[in-house]
């Protein structure tokens, strides 16, 4: 049987660019190459699609340096002709990548132009796309919309679920409407606010400290600040203003959420084929072995300091509570019309209440990430997980 050809998209324009690269290294290393022919296509930080660049299989964080998609002498641009669907992927010459007057300033071409046949080579038929892209311009419905328009099967949530879950404000709107508890909070426009007005809104909402201030549309703990209670209003306003400014560097829409007294428990959800009932893994917990001064699980703790934490699956909770987390995760996934995969992050309070923190439609996918580790502990190996996700979208 012929191998199915799978374009693996990685990198991208988001802050999470390097995390996407690391996830892709794991995915390519675990993919069943007896069934699939992976075709890695990198996206540079400025949005150029390239092939034949640096091999992502060798990337890791052992050296402490974050990998990025770079244009090398061997790199060639990838162009798309949306009208040709699964046969609409083409490769240009290296000189086309940065040539301003070559006509290749965009990734879109029309092969109805006879001239294009002299300068572009077909990538061949693509059976599916696996977008291992985190954050905006990849996990937010934009790439999903492009692939929908082309009629190319792809792994993961569709346009609506991707967009709704990328924007934490609208995740709350959807989940609240579905009767699923979320952390109390307010939304602030970082382009136009006064700290006094924000503080008044926080007080009107009855939020208690500490507060977590975060970008609405960012991940991997970028731009997140923990704000403690101050002794006076002026200091409190200064702290809030600084935290909103930090979050505003990543997104003008900023959430100010009440810190929840509870444990952060994560659950992996799998639904390879649209319309099937979603499955939920045993929930897991990231246990902090030591913390930085901010006392929360920040970017460095997640990715740069291997000694900062370890993953426990299943989490050390009563089975009844674990089952409640699984149930809430499935309900949340269905509420946003999820398909493919998601990691549902929850808080479990001391009285056993399960609240959804956020839904990641393309969670970290490295071998040590929670999503594959949770499924491995539930009986689905890393390789089997990737196989099921791809085969679920094949025609």
From Swiss-Prot:
State which pathway it belongs to: Cell wall biogenesis; peptidoglycan biosynthesis
Annotated binding of ATP, by residue: 204-266
Q: Name one GO biological process term.
A: regulation of cell shape
Record-linked Pfam families: Dala_Dala_lig_C, Dala_Dala_lig_N
Q: The organism's lineage? A: Bacteria, Bacillati, Actinomycetota, Actinomycetes, Bifidobacteriales
Cofactor(s) recorded for this entry are:
Mg(2+); Mn(2+)
Q: Which organism is it from?
A: Bifidobacterium longum (strain DJO10A)
Please name the InterPro entries in this protein's record: ATP-grasp, ATP_grasp_subdomain_1, D-Ala_lig_Van_CS, D_ala_D_ala, Dala_Dala_lig_C, Dala_Dala_lig_N, PreATP-grasp_dom_sf
Which transformation does this protein catalyse, written as a reaction?
Answer: 2 D-alanine + ATP = D-alanyl-D-alanine + ADP + phosphate + H(+)
What top-tier enzyme class does this entry carry? Answer: ligase
A GO molecular function annotation here is:
metal ion binding
Where the record annotates domain ATP-grasp, the positions are 172-391
Q: Where does Mg(2+) 2 bind?
A: 358, 360
Which UniProt keyword terms apply here?
A: ATP-binding, Cell shape, Cell wall biogenesis/degradation, Cytoplasm, Ligase, Magnesium, Manganese, Metal-binding, Nucleotide-binding, Peptidoglycan synthesis
Documented EC number(s): 6.3.2.4
Q: Where does it live in the cell?
A: Cytoplasm
Q: Could you identify this protein by its name? A: D-alanine--D-alanine ligase
Give the record's GO CC terms: cytosol
> In UniProt terms, what function does this protein have?
Cell wall formation.
Q: How is the cofactor bound?
A: Binds 2 magnesium or manganese ions per subunit.
- PANTHER family given in the database record: D-ALANINE--D-ALANINE LIGASE, D-ALANINE--D-ALANINE LIGASE A
- Family assignment? Belongs to the D-alanine--D-alanine ligase family.
């Amino acid at each position: 049987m012929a191998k199915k050809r799978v374009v693996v998209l990685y990198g991208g324009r988001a802050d999470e660019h390097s995390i996407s690269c690391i996830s892709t290294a794991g995915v390519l290393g675990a993919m069943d190459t007896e069934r699939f022919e992976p075709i890695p296509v990198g996206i540079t930080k400025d949005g150029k699609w390239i092939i034949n660049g640096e091999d992502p299989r060798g990337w890791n964080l052992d050296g402490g340096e974050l990998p990025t998609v770079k244009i090398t002498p061997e790199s060639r641009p990838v162009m798309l002709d949306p009208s040709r669907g699964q046969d609409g992927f083409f490769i240009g010459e290296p000189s086309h990548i940065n040539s301003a007057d070559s006509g290749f300033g965009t990734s879109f071409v029309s092969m109805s132009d006879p001239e294009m046949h002299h300068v572009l080579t077909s990538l061949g038929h693509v059976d599916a796309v696996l977008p291992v892209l985190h954050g905006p311009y990849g996990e937010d419905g934009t790439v999903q919309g492009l692939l929908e328009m082309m009629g190319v099967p792809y792994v993961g949530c569709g346009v609506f679920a991707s967009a709704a879950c990328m924007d934490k404000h609208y995740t709350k709107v959807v989940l609240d409407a579905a009767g699923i508890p979320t952390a109390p909070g307010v939304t602030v426009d970082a382009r136009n606010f006064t700290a006094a007005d924000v503080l008044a809104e926080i007080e009107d909402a009855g939020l208690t400290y500490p507060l977590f201030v975060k970008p609405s549309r960012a991940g991997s703990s970028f731009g997140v600040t923990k704000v403690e209670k101050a002794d006076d209003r002026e200091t409190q306003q200064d702290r809030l203003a600084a935290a909103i400014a930090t979050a505003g560097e990543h997104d003008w829409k900023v959430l100010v959420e009440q810190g929840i007294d509870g444990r952060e428990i994560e659950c992996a959800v799998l639904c390879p084929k649209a319309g099937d009932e979603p499955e939920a893994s045993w929930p897991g917990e990231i246990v902090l072995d030591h913390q930085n001064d901010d006392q929360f699980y920040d970017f460095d703790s997640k990715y740069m300091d291997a000694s900062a934490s370890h993953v426990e699956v299943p989490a050390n909770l009563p089975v009844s509570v674990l089952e409640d987390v699984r149930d809430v995760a499935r309900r949340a996934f269905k509420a946003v019309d999820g398909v493919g995969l998601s990691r549902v992050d929850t808080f479990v309070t001391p009285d056993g209440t399960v609240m959804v923190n956020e839904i990641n439609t393309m969670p970290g996918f490295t071998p040590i990430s929670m999503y594959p580790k949770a499924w491995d502990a539930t009986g689905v190996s890393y390789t089997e997980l990737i196989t099921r996700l791809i085969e679920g979208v094949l025609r």
